[in-house]
Every structure is written in C-alpha cells, then in structure tokens.
C-alpha cells in the first residue's frame, strides 16, 4: 500500500470517528420507562375512551369500573392532576353505577370509612389544607342537618353525620391548634330555597342537596390546589427524581440505597393517603350526581 493510500485511510477514519452514531428512529422512545403518573393516565384515558365509545354495554360497564380506580391513581401519582383524576373517577363511577343498573346489577357508590380517613394522619400536606377540608365537611354536615329537619328530599341525618365525622377526622389529621370549623353557619339562602337553588358557579338551577355536595367537593379541591397541586413534591417528584421543592433536580451524590428505599416508601404511603382524600372528594361528587347535579364536563371543570 502506498503512503498516499495510507494517508487517505487515516484521514477517512479520523473523519468517521468525529461523527456521532446515527439515531435509530423510535429507539429513544422505546427505551423510555413511563412514570407511575404516565402509566396511570394512559390506562385511565384508554378505559374512559372505551366507556364513552360505541361499544357493547358490558364492555362499557367493565371499562367504567376499571376507570374508577385508574383515575384515583392519577390523582395520587400525578402532581398536577389531582382535581382531574378525582372528578374523572367520580364520572366513571357514576357511569358504572348507571350502566350496572341497566344490566340489572346492584352497584353502589364508594364511601370512605372512618378507619381509612384516620390513615390520612401524616400525609405530606400543609395542616391548613386539611383544616380547610374539615371546614368544608362541617359546613356541608350542618346544611344537610337543617335540610333533613325540613324533610328535604335527599337530605338525611346519616348523610349529615358522615360529613361531620369526616370533618372531625380531617381536623385531627391536620395537627392544627385552632379548630377552623364554625359548627354553626349562615343558612339564610338555604332556608329561602331548601329544595332548589341557583349554582353561582354555573348558573344552573339544581337541587339544594346536590349543590351542598358539589360545593363541598369544590372547596376541598380548591384547598388541595392551594397546597401546591396536591402535595407537589417537597421530597420526590412522581418521575422518581429527588427535588428541592422548586422543581430543580437535586445533584447530591451521597444518597445511599437505604435512603432511596426510605424515600420510595414514604412516597408510596403518601400516594395511598392521597387516594383516600381523592376518594372522599369523589364520593361528594357522586352524591351530587345521585341527587341531581349534571355530570357533564362543562359544569365540573373550571
């Protein structure tokens, strides 16, 4: 081989080594590991599409049943989708109960037990958030008690008691020294319109009992949003990156496997507590549906 040929080969090799490897279409996408939030959202969205699609009623019913829990998972694991997951879960549950009835079933709406609410103790939320939620429960309980005394359809003392008990448990979980619940509230508008009222948010005329439930849910969702999009991670974002609370990735390199395990455990426990709160709020929304509040997006999403 002549010297000139060797020089050409050397130059060619140098040029090739300076080039980056060609990108294979789809490779990066296929190697991407979806986060818990992404997995939950995609599953919930797919089930909802089937639920609302032109499918056999049994397929729609089963999809609705699946979507209930999947949207609750979205609420718990997606830092910016607590309200969406909670409302969608309620809509899916209402659809499941409606379709189940048409199929001759005996489906009922979810409720949250006192023991489940006690598990909220220790959740990574500001005490003021739980305090605001307890206030919403107590107010709804008081209104329901007044309406039950006036024999308003749908208003019962048991419904009132559930709200008040939830309010007490949420206040206990808040750790606040001052109780935000007022116990007695201004109900002049309720007394003037015990059967139906105009919803100030939508302008709809709806049953007063239904409005009481939906207003309770709205107050609680607003409290969660004020907290920072439902416990927006002070420790771990839902994609698995440690954060400092401002969304910046923590560059610390001395975290041990034990600490990582502890963080994952805390995150899992917090997600479980968020599911309880999401289900509680969803139960108020489904109660509103059962009492006559419309379940369309236009009246539920601001």
Where are the regions a protein language model picked out?
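C-terminal motif of bacterial Sec signal peptides marking the signal peptidase cleavage site
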Residues: 15-18
């Amino acid at each position: 081989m002549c010297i000139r040929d060797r020089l050409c080969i050397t130059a060619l090799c140098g040029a090739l080594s300076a080039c980056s490897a060609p990108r294979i279409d789809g490779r990066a996408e296929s190697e991407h590991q979806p986060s818990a939030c992404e997995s939950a959202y995609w599953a919930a969205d797919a089930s909802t599409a089937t639920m609302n699609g032109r499918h056999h009623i049994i397929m729609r019913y089963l999809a609705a049943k699946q979507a209930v829990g999947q949207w609750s998972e979205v609420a718990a694991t997606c830092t910016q989708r607590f309200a969406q997951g909670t409302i969608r879960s309620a809509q899916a549950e209402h659809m499941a109960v409606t379709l189940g009835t048409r199929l001759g079933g005996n489906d009922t709406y979810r409720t949250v037990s006192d023991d489940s609410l006690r598990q909220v103790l220790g959740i990574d939320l500001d005490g003021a958030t739980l305090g605001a939620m307890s206030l919403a429960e107590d107010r709804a309980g008081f209104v329901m008690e007044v309406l039950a005394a006036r024999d308003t359809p749908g208003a019962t003392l048991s419904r009132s008691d559930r709200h008040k008990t939830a309010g007490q448990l949420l206040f206990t979980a808040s750790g606040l020294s001052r109780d935000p619940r007022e116990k007695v509230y201004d109900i002049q508008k309720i007394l003037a319109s015990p059967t139906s009222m105009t919803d100030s948010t939508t302008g709809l005329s709806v049953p007063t009992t239904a409005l009481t439930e939906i207003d309770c849910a709205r107050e609680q969702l607003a409290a969660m949003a004020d907290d920072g999009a439902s416990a927006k991670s002070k420790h771990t974002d839902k994609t698995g990156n440690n954060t400092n609370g401002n969304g910046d990735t923590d560059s610390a390199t001395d975290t041990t496997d034990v600490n990582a395990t502890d963080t994952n455990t805390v995150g899992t426990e917090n997600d479980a507590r968020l599911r309880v709160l999401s289900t509680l709020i969803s139960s108020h929304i489904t109660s509103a549906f059962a009492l006559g509040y419309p379940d369309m997006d236009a009246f539920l999403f601001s």
